[in-house]
């Protein structure tokens, strides 16, 4: 089975490099993901997120449109090897034609400014998955990791002993928001997304928001790049109850290669990331939710380089490690892509 990855931030990384005057292109670059690395990694489909840091731009909508323009340009420049998909049949057509597929997503629903018309405009531009929020509260709801609170925790930690500093930072990282969920506008967005056939992504969302999405929807949804909280207690990961609920709905969570979402190191120590840690999360998620709820969500180009999974061309190393840990090839086929493709087939319009 070829790789189907639900999340990377490569388009945002490329635009940042271009603004620095670098000759950054999707065909070949120094990022985690490019066409050549994907070919070596045997990819079928990559979700390309248009990620916008809401507090870094005066007009987040303008920024997401700049990212969309670059994505469109790169798809045209690389049309021999990869093509965008809007429907399930597009994926099948690309596969039959020997081309990889690209699915356009947006990471930060706040770019719409609460406008359902802008949400529909994104859909018209080809966006088929939306991560409702990143690490700030927005007009749609609340995240579990709030960058404003992180800054306050780190400032407070600087004035404390190492033990107390670690306690403060861990308290921030490991305490989920079980009270603040979706706003009324967020509820309307979730309902409109399900109506459109746009996949709802709950990665980054507060626990309260997750359960609201569960109650508001009927179709499967995803946590495109989230791991298991029982293995690494950071609240960017899903609790066992959330994993079971996601699985019962037919949803999928994507293994995230971010080292800090895989293991927690002592305060101040560098976390390089290991394949063994990814395997631990995979085994736990499958034990809790079953083999059907697990996929891939690397977070490539949105994270520091993982020491053992340095890019899209290294995916075989993870396959081999998972196989050595006891996963069968049939189970690996499901993790590598079949589970995500099953969900796409169900949610995306024909």
Annotate each predicted stretch with a short phrase:
Residues 19-40, 319:
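Short catalytic helix/loop segments, enriched in acidic residues and glycine
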Residues 30-32, 37-116, 120, 132, ...:
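A metal-dependent hydrolase metal-coordination microenvironment
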Residues 9-11, 51-53, 87, 105-109, ...:
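Active-site beta-loop-alpha junctions enriched in small/polar residues
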Residues 194, 310-350:
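Mid-to-C-terminal alpha-helical segments outside catalytic/metal-binding sites
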